[in-house]
Amino acid sequence: MRSAQVYRWQIPMDAGVVLRDRRLKTRDGLYVCLREGEREGWGEISPLPGFSQETWEEAQSVLLAWVNNWLAGDCELPQMPSVAFGVSCALAELTDALPQAANYRAAPLCNGDPDDLILKLADMPGEKVAKVKVGLYEAVRDGMVVNLLLEAIPDLHLRLDANRAWTPLKGQQFAKYVNPDYRHRIAFLEEPCKTRDDSRAFARETGIAIAWDESLREPDFTFVAEEGVRAVVIKPTLTGSLEKVREQVEAAHALGLTAVISSSIESSLGLTQLARIAAWLTPETIPGLDTLDLMQAQQVRRWPGSTLPVVEVDALERLL
């Protein structure tokens, strides 16, 4: 016997969260809970404004239609990425296809303060990895901050994310202020320039390795080994089903590229599932999941060690 519930939710964000030049005041999304006999599976559907093609209202419509079809015996996944991902997670939990083991190590997001980062990294076992958003301020400032961090913490490796913010000139301005002796400790810089060709040129000219992120979701993208390209950053909410995520990870690994499972600012429920996916598909790589503290609450499932209050399922708006 099958049954299902769909919940709508909204979490207040911290005041300083800006995505693509727009302030994100709340994180809006949906949960689906599927039951079959004694088994249960949950999934999160939370399109990311400015990044997802679909709105959460559109996702809600597709999700409700899919749930009704599933209750009638149809299991074909929807095409909409955020819905396909959430639904496939719920189905995977339902059938025990998503392992319970999780990688809760997260590359901490750094605001540029080395003292703050040293404290965050003190308890981190193994490789010291942190992430810095660049491209929000002047490229020269970004270069100076990155150089300062690498100089202050000799065993640090940084992941940088520019979200295609730079022109070739700005990329050169950034690199000018990063000591060439430190550049090998930049694990990768995600999508530095507005076009892939400009990003490739940046890697060749600076010796700083790059990673593809947005490019993975463009129709003309293919997985190929290229000079200067070290990694791909996979955001499952923006990608689609678990099977598609696994295919991308396997394609990257086949070329010797690092694959990083990364957050699209999901709630704690979605983040704990991403931690399980990372442990399953990319066990040797620290995932990019340090986004929970951008929110003012957790929901349904707790992230280990978080002190944020938890909203239980009974407090959510039930749609089905």
UniProtKB/Swiss-Prot annotation:
* Matches recorded under SUPFAM superfamilies: Enolase C-terminal domain-like, Enolase N-terminal domain-like
- Pathway in which the depicted protein is active: Quinol/quinone metabolism; 1,4-dihydroxy-2-naphthoate biosynthesis; 1,4-dihydroxy-2-naphthoate from chorismate: step 4/7; Quinol/quinone metabolism; menaquinone biosynthesis
* Name this protein carries in UniProt: o-succinylbenzoate synthase
User: Which BP terms from GO are recorded?
Assistant: menaquinone biosynthetic process
What HAMAP family does the database record attribute to this sequence? MenC_1
Q: Where is the active site?
A: 133, 235
List the catalysed reactions: (1R,6R)-6-hydroxy-2-succinyl-cyclohexa-2,4-diene-1-carboxylate = 2-succinylbenzoate + H2O
